């Protein structure tokens, strides 16, 4: 299957290159490198809580090819595609044969602009895509990410901003089931691998672009998840040892961004609320996936994110992400969960192409159980890195970095790392690029 996927992707690429009318848009991303720790191989932990710099040990890439297929009288068709590649970088012979390397079909869609009467700027799309993801780069987290196969319309102008509406499929797989409760228990038992997959559809509505004052802009939206069992799947799902009936769930997001021209600083404030199967995202740094492995009928949660960058001088700049989240009853035995995370990255640019980073991150997480007990987790990371870069701004790529990192799992995680240690030191080299 994976070989067929790669062959299909190559064929699509060659077909687009053979089309003489329009140029091919080529973009992508990759990261890779090598590292080692003071106790065995490089070890990573909690990068969405403590930061990603010097805390990644994989090889990951995305190759995106797109092409305009039609342009006439204000109407256009645009084809977009993307494949991803992942491996743990452990050796040279990483192939799909033994799942050492993984290939994924991430995007394959068609976008039609100018076809809706009265809405010349609106784009209607169908296929598979990354749908308007909202990213926090230094912790590698997408806090608003409803992606998959679907269809929608975007850039429907209204006032200062525009609406977007989408229907996206994001099924849950490999759920626990009790086939004895199925209307067709015999078939369920013999074909459990099909009965334990649950169809989940998302309806997503957003409005972006309202500017409440000079230098500010906003975005608001709701993502509504709808589990969709077949009749033969009703009453068969289990979670945490008991019957589980997945409920419709929502996640509401509002964000305010502001550019402080005097400081040349971008700052963002994000407020989110979610319930039932989506509530756990508020304390797991998730972006909207539905939890079908926990009893969460009464779950509710919220999250506050503050992120931004601040140039101090021509040579010094800072970037940070602060997250606080709280969720109640996201599993059968949990009363509440709280998360507090803080990550900051500082940069000193020696020249246009030479810069040094210092990144520090810390988090605390607490589970309060219905039995009256508590479980606490914490961690810290400190990274010093020197980089060869294409320019001074912090997010300029390509970049090649030499790093040393100290990770501490906290008193609660004394056996977290190799040799039953609570901390580790990593050093290595990593390359990263996007284009």
From Swiss-Prot:
InterPro entries in UniProt: G_neg_Bact_CarbUptk_Porin, Maltoporin, Porin_LamB, Porin_LamB_sf
Keywords, alphabetical: Cell outer membrane, Ion transport, Membrane, Porin, Signal, Sugar transport, Transmembrane, Transmembrane beta strand, Transport
GO molecular function per UniProt: maltodextrin transmembrane transporter activity; maltose transporting porin activity
GO biological process assignments: monoatomic ion transport
Compartments it resides in: Cell outer membrane
Cross-referenced CDD domains: Maltoporin-like
Site (Greasy slide, important in sugar transport): 29, 60, 434
Signal peptide span: 1-23
Topology within the bilayer: Multi-pass membrane protein
Record's note on what induces expression: By maltose.
The organism's place on the tree of life at top rank: Bacteria
Pfam family, one: LamB
One CC-aspect GO term: pore complex
Enzymatic reactions: beta-maltose(in) = beta-maltose(out)
Functional description taken from the UniProt entry: Involved in the transport of maltose and maltodextrins.
Family: Belongs to the porin LamB (TC 1.B.3) family.
HAMAP family tied to this protein: LamB (MF_01301)
Subunit record text: Homotrimer formed of three 18-stranded antiparallel beta-barrels, containing three independent channels.
PANTHER family, per the entry: CRYPTIC OUTER MEMBRANE PORIN BGLH-RELATED
Name of the protein this chain belongs to: Maltoporin
Organism from which the protein derives: Pectobacterium atrosepticum (strain SCRI 1043 / ATCC BAA-672) (Erwinia carotovora subsp. atroseptica)
